[in-house]
Amino acid sequence: MFDLSLGITVDPSVRFGKPVIKGTRVPVDTVVARVASGMSIKDVAEEYGITEKDIYNALHYAASN
């Protein structure tokens, strides 16, 4: 398992090694897609049981990689 910056992890045994929010099985690309589709940060956080900070970290990670 790789613990990447910003609370993002990559583990081959979780979601086939896709980057996920640390401590969850929520893929970064899913979070980014929801925000890109117009869903609010608050609604995404509530839907996936993650924090708003997790969402901003996922967006930052996606923009950097």
Predicted feature descriptions by range:
Residues 5-26:
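Short, Lys/Arg-enriched anionic-surface-contact patches
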Residues 27-65:
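Long, charge-rich, low-complexity alpha-helical segments
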